[in-house]
Amino acid sequence: MGKKKKRDGAAARRQARVVVGGVRTRAAVTARRVVASAEEGCGLVGRGGGGGSGGDDGEGGCYLRLRSRRLPFVAAAVVSSRREEALGDSVAEAASSSSSRAVELLGCSGEEEAMAEKVCTQAGEDHDEESSVGDSGCGRERSATTPSSRRPPGDADSSDAESNQEAKQQMCRRSSTTSAAAFHAGATTRSFRMMAPPAAAAEIEEFLAAAERSEAERFAAKYNFDVVRGVPLDAGGAGRFEWTAVGSG
Protein backbone atom coordinates (compact mmCIF):
# COMPACT_ATOMS: atom_id res chain seq x y z
CA MET A 1 0.00 0.00 0.00
CA GLY A 2 2.82 2.30 0.72
CA LYS A 3 4.29 1.95 -2.74
CA LYS A 4 0.93 2.57 -4.41
CA LYS A 5 0.43 5.74 -2.46
CA LYS A 6 3.86 6.91 -3.47
CA ARG A 7 3.07 6.27 -7.13
CA ASP A 8 -0.22 8.11 -6.94
CA GLY A 9 1.53 10.99 -5.33
CA ALA A 10 4.19 11.12 -8.08
CA ALA A 11 1.47 11.13 -10.78
CA ALA A 12 -0.35 13.93 -9.02
CA ARG A 13 2.83 15.94 -8.80
CA ARG A 14 3.51 15.43 -12.54
CA GLN A 15 -0.03 16.48 -13.43
CA ALA A 16 0.38 19.50 -11.23
CA ARG A 17 3.54 20.39 -13.08
CA VAL A 18 1.75 20.08 -16.46
CA VAL A 19 -1.34 22.07 -15.46
CA VAL A 20 -0.53 25.16 -13.46
CA GLY A 21 -3.49 27.44 -12.81
CA GLY A 22 -5.52 26.06 -15.71
CA VAL A 23 -2.75 26.73 -18.32
CA ARG A 24 -1.14 23.87 -20.26
CA THR A 25 2.59 23.78 -20.76
CA ARG A 26 4.35 23.83 -24.14
CA ALA A 27 5.20 20.12 -24.08
CA ALA A 28 1.59 19.05 -23.54
CA VAL A 29 0.29 21.32 -26.31
CA THR A 30 2.89 19.99 -28.76
CA ALA A 31 2.06 16.39 -27.88
CA ARG A 32 -1.66 16.97 -28.38
CA ARG A 33 -1.03 18.59 -31.77
CA VAL A 34 1.07 15.63 -32.90
CA VAL A 35 -1.64 13.17 -31.85
CA ALA A 36 -4.39 15.21 -33.55
CA SER A 37 -2.44 15.49 -36.82
CA ALA A 38 -1.74 11.74 -36.80
CA GLU A 39 -5.43 10.95 -36.27
CA GLU A 40 -6.46 13.33 -39.04
CA GLY A 41 -3.94 11.78 -41.47
CA CYS A 42 -5.26 8.30 -40.72
CA GLY A 43 -8.79 9.48 -41.36
CA LEU A 44 -7.84 10.99 -44.72
CA VAL A 45 -6.09 7.78 -45.78
CA GLY A 46 -9.17 5.77 -44.87
CA ARG A 47 -11.45 8.10 -46.83
CA GLY A 48 -9.16 8.04 -49.92
CA GLY A 49 -9.81 4.38 -50.68
CA GLY A 50 -13.60 4.75 -50.40
CA GLY A 51 -13.86 7.76 -52.74
CA GLY A 52 -16.31 9.62 -50.48
CA SER A 53 -14.77 13.11 -50.30
CA GLY A 54 -11.62 12.53 -52.38
CA GLY A 55 -13.34 13.26 -55.72
CA ASP A 56 -11.56 12.02 -58.83
CA ASP A 57 -8.24 11.66 -56.96
CA GLY A 58 -9.76 9.24 -54.45
CA GLU A 59 -9.70 6.32 -56.88
CA GLY A 60 -6.78 4.28 -55.59
CA GLY A 61 -5.01 7.30 -53.96
CA CYS A 62 -4.93 9.51 -50.87
CA TYR A 63 -4.01 13.01 -49.66
CA LEU A 64 -0.87 13.95 -47.77
CA ARG A 65 -1.48 17.07 -45.68
CA LEU A 66 1.50 19.39 -45.28
CA ARG A 67 1.83 22.70 -43.50
CA SER A 68 1.02 24.83 -46.61
CA ARG A 69 -0.84 22.54 -49.07
CA ARG A 70 -2.10 19.02 -49.75
CA LEU A 71 -0.40 16.67 -52.22
CA PRO A 72 -2.59 14.04 -53.97
CA PHE A 73 -1.08 10.58 -54.48
CA VAL A 74 -2.60 8.59 -57.39
CA ALA A 75 -2.01 4.87 -57.77
CA ALA A 76 0.00 3.58 -60.77
CA ALA A 77 -2.95 1.48 -62.00
CA VAL A 78 -5.13 4.59 -62.34
CA VAL A 79 -2.42 6.42 -64.29
CA SER A 80 -1.92 3.51 -66.69
CA SER A 81 -5.68 3.17 -67.28
CA ARG A 82 -5.96 6.86 -68.11
CA ARG A 83 -3.05 6.62 -70.55
CA GLU A 84 -4.67 3.62 -72.24
CA GLU A 85 -7.94 5.54 -72.61
CA ALA A 86 -6.15 8.51 -74.24
CA LEU A 87 -4.28 6.17 -76.59
CA GLY A 88 -7.52 4.43 -77.57
CA ASP A 89 -9.17 7.78 -78.37
CA SER A 90 -6.25 8.82 -80.61
CA VAL A 91 -6.30 5.46 -82.44
CA ALA A 92 -10.06 5.77 -83.02
CA GLU A 93 -9.66 9.27 -84.47
CA ALA A 94 -6.88 8.09 -86.81
CA ALA A 95 -9.01 5.15 -87.98
CA SER A 96 -12.00 7.41 -88.69
CA SER A 97 -9.85 9.85 -90.72
CA SER A 98 -8.29 7.01 -92.76
CA SER A 99 -11.73 5.51 -93.46
CA SER A 100 -13.04 8.86 -94.72
CA ARG A 101 -9.96 9.18 -96.95
CA ALA A 102 -10.58 5.70 -98.38
CA VAL A 103 -14.22 6.59 -99.07
CA GLU A 104 -13.13 9.68 -101.02
CA LEU A 105 -10.68 7.65 -103.11
CA LEU A 106 -13.27 4.97 -103.82
CA GLY A 107 -15.75 7.63 -104.84
CA CYS A 108 -13.29 9.10 -107.34
CA SER A 109 -12.53 5.67 -108.86
CA GLY A 110 -16.25 4.88 -109.17
CA GLU A 111 -16.82 8.19 -110.96
CA GLU A 112 -13.99 7.41 -113.37
CA GLU A 113 -15.42 3.95 -114.11
CA ALA A 114 -18.85 5.44 -114.77
CA MET A 115 -17.38 7.97 -117.20
CA ALA A 116 -15.45 5.20 -119.00
CA GLU A 117 -18.62 3.13 -119.42
CA LYS A 118 -20.45 6.16 -120.78
CA VAL A 119 -17.67 6.79 -123.32
CA CYS A 120 -17.71 3.16 -124.47
CA THR A 121 -21.47 3.21 -125.04
CA GLN A 122 -21.28 6.43 -127.07
CA ALA A 123 -18.36 5.30 -129.31
CA GLY A 124 -20.45 5.39 -132.52
CA GLU A 125 -21.67 8.98 -132.14
CA ASP A 126 -20.12 12.10 -133.62
CA HIS A 127 -17.18 13.61 -131.68
CA ASP A 128 -18.51 17.18 -131.69
CA GLU A 129 -21.92 16.10 -130.46
CA GLU A 130 -20.33 13.99 -127.74
CA SER A 131 -18.14 16.91 -126.65
CA SER A 132 -21.12 19.25 -126.36
CA VAL A 133 -23.11 16.67 -124.41
CA GLY A 134 -20.14 15.98 -122.14
CA ASP A 135 -19.63 19.69 -121.47
CA SER A 136 -23.29 20.19 -120.59
CA GLY A 137 -23.25 17.12 -118.34
CA CYS A 138 -20.11 18.30 -116.58
CA GLY A 139 -21.72 21.71 -116.06
CA ARG A 140 -24.83 20.17 -114.54
CA GLU A 141 -22.79 17.90 -112.29
CA ARG A 142 -20.53 20.78 -111.24
CA SER A 143 -23.56 22.92 -110.36
CA ALA A 144 -25.06 20.00 -108.43
CA THR A 145 -21.90 19.23 -106.47
CA THR A 146 -20.97 22.86 -105.71
CA PRO A 147 -21.10 23.41 -101.90
CA SER A 148 -23.79 25.82 -100.82
CA SER A 149 -22.76 29.29 -99.67
CA ARG A 150 -25.38 29.16 -96.93
CA ARG A 151 -23.45 26.55 -94.96
CA PRO A 152 -23.14 27.32 -91.23
CA PRO A 153 -19.73 28.67 -90.10
CA GLY A 154 -19.07 25.66 -87.84
CA ASP A 155 -19.01 23.27 -90.82
CA ALA A 156 -15.67 24.46 -92.29
CA ASP A 157 -13.99 21.03 -92.19
CA SER A 158 -16.78 19.33 -94.14
CA SER A 159 -16.78 22.12 -96.76
CA ASP A 160 -13.01 21.73 -97.24
CA ALA A 161 -13.42 17.97 -97.67
CA GLU A 162 -16.19 18.49 -100.24
CA SER A 163 -14.09 21.00 -102.20
CA ASN A 164 -11.15 18.56 -102.28
CA GLN A 165 -13.44 15.77 -103.47
CA GLU A 166 -14.89 18.04 -106.17
CA ALA A 167 -11.40 18.92 -107.44
CA LYS A 168 -10.49 15.23 -107.62
CA GLN A 169 -13.68 14.47 -109.55
CA GLN A 170 -12.92 17.26 -112.04
CA MET A 171 -9.42 15.86 -112.59
CA CYS A 172 -10.89 12.39 -113.17
CA ARG A 173 -13.40 13.79 -115.68
CA ARG A 174 -10.68 15.65 -117.58
CA SER A 175 -8.46 12.58 -117.82
CA SER A 176 -11.38 10.39 -118.98
CA THR A 177 -12.44 12.99 -121.59
CA THR A 178 -8.88 13.21 -122.96
CA SER A 179 -8.58 9.43 -123.19
CA ALA A 180 -11.97 9.23 -124.90
CA ALA A 181 -10.96 11.85 -127.50
CA ALA A 182 -7.73 9.98 -128.24
CA PHE A 183 -9.66 6.71 -128.56
CA HIS A 184 -12.17 8.24 -131.01
CA ALA A 185 -9.39 9.83 -133.09
CA GLY A 186 -7.55 6.53 -133.37
CA ALA A 187 -10.74 4.65 -134.24
CA THR A 188 -11.64 7.20 -136.96
CA THR A 189 -8.18 6.94 -138.55
CA ARG A 190 -8.30 3.15 -138.54
CA SER A 191 -11.78 3.15 -140.11
CA PHE A 192 -10.66 5.48 -142.92
CA ARG A 193 -7.64 3.29 -143.59
CA MET A 194 -9.74 0.16 -143.75
CA MET A 195 -12.59 1.65 -145.81
CA ALA A 196 -10.45 3.47 -148.44
CA PRO A 197 -10.54 1.36 -151.69
CA PRO A 198 -7.41 0.93 -153.87
CA ALA A 199 -6.94 3.34 -156.79
CA ALA A 200 -8.11 2.07 -160.21
CA ALA A 201 -5.78 1.70 -163.21
CA ALA A 202 -7.72 4.32 -165.20
CA GLU A 203 -7.20 6.92 -162.47
CA ILE A 204 -3.48 6.17 -162.38
CA GLU A 205 -3.22 6.48 -166.19
CA GLU A 206 -5.11 9.76 -166.16
CA PHE A 207 -2.83 11.20 -163.47
CA LEU A 208 0.33 10.15 -165.35
CA ALA A 209 -1.02 11.27 -168.75
CA ALA A 210 -1.52 14.81 -167.53
CA ALA A 211 2.06 14.93 -166.24
CA GLU A 212 3.44 13.46 -169.50
CA ARG A 213 1.44 15.93 -171.59
CA SER A 214 2.81 18.93 -169.75
CA GLU A 215 6.37 17.60 -170.03
CA ALA A 216 5.95 17.00 -173.82
CA GLU A 217 4.69 20.53 -174.37
CA ARG A 218 7.63 21.99 -172.47
CA PHE A 219 10.15 19.88 -174.46
CA ALA A 220 8.53 20.80 -177.80
CA ALA A 221 8.56 24.50 -176.99
CA LYS A 222 12.26 24.38 -176.12
CA TYR A 223 13.76 21.83 -178.55
CA ASN A 224 11.19 21.88 -181.39
CA PHE A 225 10.77 18.11 -181.20
CA ASP A 226 7.75 15.89 -180.62
CA VAL A 227 8.73 13.27 -178.05
CA VAL A 228 5.42 11.43 -178.35
CA ARG A 229 5.85 10.57 -182.03
CA GLY A 230 9.65 10.84 -182.04
CA VAL A 231 9.89 13.27 -184.99
CA PRO A 232 11.09 16.88 -185.24
CA LEU A 233 8.58 19.64 -185.73
CA ASP A 234 8.43 22.07 -188.63
CA ALA A 235 11.13 24.67 -189.01
CA GLY A 236 8.62 27.43 -188.36
CA GLY A 237 7.97 26.16 -184.85
CA ALA A 238 8.49 28.08 -181.68
CA GLY A 239 11.59 26.14 -180.66
CA ARG A 240 15.15 27.43 -180.92
CA PHE A 241 16.50 24.32 -182.61
CA GLU A 242 16.27 23.15 -186.24
CA TRP A 243 16.57 19.51 -187.16
CA THR A 244 18.34 18.24 -190.33
CA ALA A 245 18.40 14.77 -191.75
CA VAL A 246 21.76 13.03 -191.59
CA GLY A 247 22.68 10.37 -194.15
CA SER A 248 23.41 6.90 -192.91
CA GLY A 249 26.35 6.36 -195.35
Swiss-Prot record:
Signal peptide: none annotated. Residues 161-180 have a biased composition (Polar residues). Residues 118-180 are annotated as: Disordered. GO terms for cellular component: nucleus. The keyword Cytoplasm does not apply. GO terms for biological process: regulation of cell cycle. Keywords: Protein kinase inhibitor. The keyword S-adenosyl-L-methionine does not apply. GO terms for molecular function: cyclin-dependent protein serine/threonine kinase inhibitor activity. It comes from the Eukaryota. Gene3D superfamilies: p27. InterPro entries: CDI_dom (IPR003175), CDI_dom_sf (IPR044898), KRP (IPR044275). PANTHER family: CYCLIN-DEPENDENT KINASE INHIBITOR 4-RELATED. Belongs to the CDI family. ICK/KRP subfamily. This is Cyclin-dependent kinase inhibitor 2. It comes from Oryza sativa subsp. japonica.
